[in-house]
Each structure stands twice: as structure tokens, then as C-alpha cells.
Amino acid sequence: MSRKILGILGVAAAALLLATPVQAQKSKDTLRIVINDMFGAIDPYNFPHDEAGSFYRTIYSNLLDFDEYHQKFVPSLAKSWKRVSNTVLEFDLRDDITFHNGNKFDADDVVETLNWLRDEKTKIRFKDRYDWTIPEKLGPHKIRITAKQPFSTDMSNLAYRFKILDGETMKSLSNMGDYGRTNPVATGPYKVVDFDANRGLVLEAVANHWDKTPYSRAPAKRVHGVPVPDRQTQVAKFLAGEIDLLRNVEPETAKELGGMGAVVNPTPAQNLLYVTLDAAGRSKNKIMTDERVRKAFIMAIPRDQIVKTFVPGGDTAEQPPGICFKRTVACKPDVGLYPYNPAEAKKLLIEAGYPNGVDLVLDVFAPSRQIAEAIAGEIRKVGFRTTVNPMTLGVYVKRRGDGEFTAFVGYYPTAAQPDMANLLDFFFGADRDYWKDQMIHDIAAKGNLEFDVEKRGQLYVPALNQINQKAYIYPVSELPLLFVSSKDVKVLNNPLSAAESRLGDYAWSDYKEVRPSK
């Protein structure tokens, strides 16, 4: 923790004991949550950002959901469905749902949403997640979705990725980028009542919401997402009683706040913290095209020490054997990572022609800066003269896509769709591919055609082994979400996801939780 934050903690400690705004806000049933990196839209398609996702996954609804605890698909906007063939699915929709603006939900909304997603003119990130569908209206509340070709994770994609928009609102907009900025209309248990880059985001629980199951709970009447990008200011506001819940807090800061009476809650998140190494030579610095240099980088990192010291909730964080977790569907690598061995790392650098070491810029999305600094400190010991370069999300995404990174630290919310097919698409798809390994691309394509999960898992084994053997990606750790809250607030386990936090999981301490039954 920085001395500045320590100073704030020391000066403001009394404020935690004296503050009354928290209790006052509870009486108003308004839960105030800090937003670390304010998003430009409440939109799952134009702004697919992890922190924004914790909000929009409770604002929007899918055709169906997947209950990870009971390993089954459950109804949402669709009350039933059937597989007609390996390319055709049919859905019967509920007829008692209205959007937050009062418009009735029907088949037209699904068709309008899916047609927009697959339109060549629609420019969004991760376009290939959505353009495989061909929707057809069979009746007012019945649709057919045909895939362009057999797609083994079609149901999973629909359950995790496809948020249905209001067709009437879509037709009224000349620019669909405005949907999440000016008209974030949806069908979820919370609705947007105010959205401003400075004031933040205010949501309100929908009265008499159509989904009465525990999957769509809204524990607080109102939720105010307050944008505060600076950690020092976040801590000060929390201690002054102006914020009820901090998200993604550094371990040392959480420990100090916990000692003052705050509630510290590490929550499994299955966010994959990783380092990508530019084996394809896309960046100007070509050092990572040499497999020996990549191995030296990895073998210089004492993973267990870094995870337990710098990763929030590191004592319980999963250290995955590859680019996927135990809960990830079809994840079965049988070749492990290169072990920590700094002496061997030095030797490999010398063999690669760098007896005097080598210069390296380690780029990082700003929230993971502390961990990147820890990694840099270790690899410097074996000869990597490393400069850490943190940046905002927008800059990070653009520079990554432009192929400017030699080595970079990032994290990916695998729980957004915990399937190996999704992870291979994320790392090796579009402009995110820093390896250009045709074998991995071929295996991913074969996996998309295999509907048997066990067989699909076996198909992926050579690809996962190749990633580890060639030292393409170093999976550092799970990155749990470390929440710090007042004693009036608690963080619940999500009723659908075993490793994801959403808005309906933040509740007052006296909230009575009801879990879904089998």
C-alpha cells in the first residue's frame, strides 16, 4: 500500500466510527458501490467490460441461463426450448414480460437483436461470438435460431452472451451506440433511472418483476454506482461513510480497513490473470520469438510467492495449470507449466544470445499494475531490464489489437462463459492472437463441431499442452474479487454463477437469502 493511502487510513480512522451516512442511506434503501473505471455505456455489446458486466448482467436478460451449481440450463425470457438438429434450436417465449419502458416483449425483440448482431455493418468487439445466428419468427412468442454451421457451444453462448434488447427502441435510434448511453432499456430485475459520466449510475429494483425465482433477486431498492477512479479518494470516501462497498481492493488496503471494523470479503471470480508473450513477433521488439527467452521469463517468476503476497484473496486463489480453471468446461491440460528456476532462466537468456540481459517493456491494464511491478522485480533478477507501462482500458485494447505489445499483463473474466471454446476464441481470435499457431486454430475449429463435452475436452488437450510447452501464455492466478464493505452490507454468492459477482449479490446485512432448488 502507498504511504499516501496509509496516511489517509491513519487520519480518517475516526471517521469510520463517527460516520452516520451509511446508516442514513440504508434507511433510504440506497446501496452505494464504487466504480473503479467508469464505463461509457450500459451495453453488453458496445462496452463488454468486466466491471460494467456486474451491472448490465442484472439489467438485461437472456433467453435462458445456466445454473452452474446444478449444471443445467434454466428458463428466462424463454420458458422452454428444443434442439431440432445440430444447427437448429427453437424457443417458446414468455408472454407476460414488459421492458423497463413499458413495451411488451415478444419474438420481434429477439429477431431484431440477433439480426443487428449479425449485420455486417454492426461493428462491435468480439463480433464472432454473435454472428453465427440466423433468427426466424415462428409466432408472436416463438422463434427459431439456425446456426450457419454446427456449433457445439450454441446453447452456452445464448445463455451467457446474448442479452435481448427492446426492438422498438432499437428502431428509433440512428446510432445503436446510443442504446446503452441514452436508452438502456431491458427486462432485468434492476432498471436504469440515471446515467452520467460524473454522477455515475443509479438503478432501481423493478416492482413486481416477472421473474420470481431466486435467480433474479434485487436485494436493495436502489443501487448507486459512484465513479471514483483514484484508490486514495475511494478509501477516504468509504471511511467518511460516502461509499458502502469497495470492489477489487488491494490486499494490504483491505487488511488495514478490516482492522478498523470494515467487512472484508474475498469472492471467487475465475478472473484469469495472465502474461502474454509475443511469440509471433508482432511488436517491434522481437525477443519473445525465441522460445528460450519466453521460458526464461516464465521460470524467473515465483508464482506462489507473488500470488499470496499481491493477489487479493491470494491465499485461496486458484493457480491454474493452464489458461483455464478446474470449473472451466472441457479444460484438461496434461502438460504443466515451467517451474520457478531463476538459475535456469539466466542460463536460457545466455543461450539465446543475451549474456548481458535484455530490455523489455511490460505493458499492463492499470488495475493489475501492482502485480506487474512484482513480476518485473523478479524477472529483473535474471536479466530482463524491465519497465512497467500501465494504461487505461481503451488504450490497452487498441494497442493490443495493433500488435504493439512484447509482453503484457491482463486479466480475463472466464466466468462470463466458463468454457474452453470461449477461452481459445479469446486468446487466439481476431486481433488478440500473438502466436499464429495453426495447430491451435485447427483444434479450436474441430472443437466447435463436437457436441460431446468429454470428446471435446480430449480434442483440446494438444492445444492446451502446446500453449504450456511453447511458453505462449503464463497463467499467473485466479484474480478473486476482494470486496470491502460497511457492517451494514454483505456480498452473497451468485445463484447462477459459481465464480461471478453481479449487482443482485450486494445486499444489506439483514437480507434473507433464498437459494434455487434442484
Residue ranges and their predicted role:
Residues L117, I134-K137, V193-E204, V226-K284, ...:
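Extracellular/periplasmic solute-recognition and catalytic clefts
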Residues D37-G53, S76-L77, N103, D154-K163, ...:
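A structural "hinge/loop" feature
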Residues V34-S85, N115, V185:
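N-terminal lobe/hinge region of extracytoplasmic solute-binding protein
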Residues R32, D106-N115, P140-T146, G188-P189, ...:
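Alpha-helical secondary-structure segments
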Residues Y190, K284, D315-E351, Q370:
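Structural transition elements
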Residues F39, D196-G200, A205, L273, ...:
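Detector for C-terminal structural segments
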Residues D67-E68, K72, A159-A218, R222-H224, ...:
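Gly/Pro-rich hinge or "lid" segments in bacterial periplasmic/extracellular proteins
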Residues Q25-K26, K82, F126-M170, D194-D196:
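Surface-exposed binding/hinge segments that line
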